[in-house]
């Protein structure tokens, strides 16, 4: 589970769940083929498409020093109809 950091739950990602598309943040150095192979192997699903984009880091100030957070990559994984990925984290009660 080195490639995928965590699942993303935003308004857009929740809307994409209806189209059988799952969104997650992955390691910046990971390639599409690595992530596709890992998802198919770990979850036992068939991936038909993957879209990715790199999100920029944000500026952070600590007193007089200006810094920034690291950039990261987000993948939108489309599965074949009939397949699904269970939630990666259960809801707290």
UniProtKB/Swiss-Prot annotation:
Subcellular location: Plastid, Chloroplast
Domain of life: Eukaryota
Record's keyword terms, sorted: Chloroplast, Plastid, Ribonucleoprotein, Ribosomal protein, RNA-binding, rRNA-binding
Principal subcellular localisation of the protein: plastid
InterPro entries: Nucleotide-bd_a/b_plait_sf, Ribosomal_uL23-like, Ribosomal_uL23/eL15/eS24_sf, Ribosomal_uL23_CS
Gene Ontology CC entries for this record: chloroplast; ribonucleoprotein complex; ribosome
Example of a GO biological process term: translation
Entry keyword annotation includes Zinc: no
GO MF terms, alphabetically ordered: mRNA binding; rRNA binding; structural constituent of ribosome
Family in the record: Belongs to the universal ribosomal protein uL23 family.
Role noted for this protein: Binds to 23S rRNA.
Oligomer status and interactors: Part of the 50S ribosomal subunit.
Name the record gives this protein: Large ribosomal subunit protein uL23cz/uL23cy
Source organism per UniProt: Nicotiana tabacum (Common tobacco)
């Amino acid at each position: 589970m080195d490639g995928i950091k965590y699942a993303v739950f935003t308004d857009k990602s929740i809307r994409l769940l209806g189209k059988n598309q799952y969104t997650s943040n992955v390691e910046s150095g990971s390639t599409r083929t690595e992530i596709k192979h890992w998802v198919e192997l770990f979850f036992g699903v068939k991936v038909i498409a993957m879209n990715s984009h790199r999100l920029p880091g944000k500026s952070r100030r600590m007193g007089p020093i200006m810094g920034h957070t690291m950039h990261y990559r987000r993948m939108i994984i489309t599965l074949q109809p009939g397949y699904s990925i269970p939630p990666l984290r259960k809801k707290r009660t």
